[in-house]
Amino acid sequence: MRQEGVWLRGNMHMHTTRSDGRVSVEEAIARYERAGYDFIAVTDHWVRSEKGTTAGGMLLLSGCEYNIGDTVQQGVYHIVGVGMETAPALERTEKSPQRIIDEINAAGGVAILAHPAWSLNSAEDVARLTGLCGTEIYNTTSAVPPNVRPYSGLFVDQLASLGVLLPCMGADDAHRYVHDAAVCAIMVHAREKSHEAVMEAIRAGDFYATMGPSVSLTVEGGEAVVACSPAAQVEFYSDAVWNDSRVTQGEGITTARCRLLPFETFVRAEVVDSEGRRAFSSPVRVK
């Protein structure tokens, strides 16, 4: 990541009374502004929000969630579009996830796979899709209550093992605004605080997902190296089923290393702080 620029905290998946959320657009925006967020995208189902800026300076990216399929047998795909300059040419009768991705991109936005663990998406099916900008590795509203599958790390690893390394994003997917708001965010490293710079950084993959801690992952001389805010545990994930250096535990950890095995093709990292909050890097190709 670039050294210059600014770090900006954002949420790019949330709902209001315009679809299945329980608060108004105005209240949803206010909740995140009070929580200190720098940017958000309101992503109601099949209702595109507009780009803007609040009086307090929080950036509003345009957004929408396009969902298809009701059962795993049919295939459940929820795809979030962010930053579209025009309305994607899509109807609610659409059945193709690939066409949704294509139309989001054609409208100037980025397409994000939402909560793949919740949707029980298979890595093999998603590997056939093209044009995704990233996937949610953690989705707050998919946690208890009312759901039970918030974490998609296994999916990310299975997909990366097939050679598809999707950047990892964090999102609240807020509906109730009780337990599911301002929990898991995306931290974007942008050249400045502007709509254009945020979208540029997202497209470049200059971000990580977090509930609070910071994380940076590099590969140096046969090792994966993490730099982070003070942590209780650092975990390394890859396509090796066994690596005896993949976990570092202690107090106030700010750096950790994992020896890479000759056959590993990717690595990613997670940081856990003393409160149990996590930060998630994206997977990095090592060969």
Give the positions of each predicted feature:
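A metal-dependent hydrolase metal-coordination microenvironment
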Residues: 1-114, 118-132, 136-158, 169-171, ...
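C-terminal functional module detector
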Residues: 1-7, 163-167, 174-287
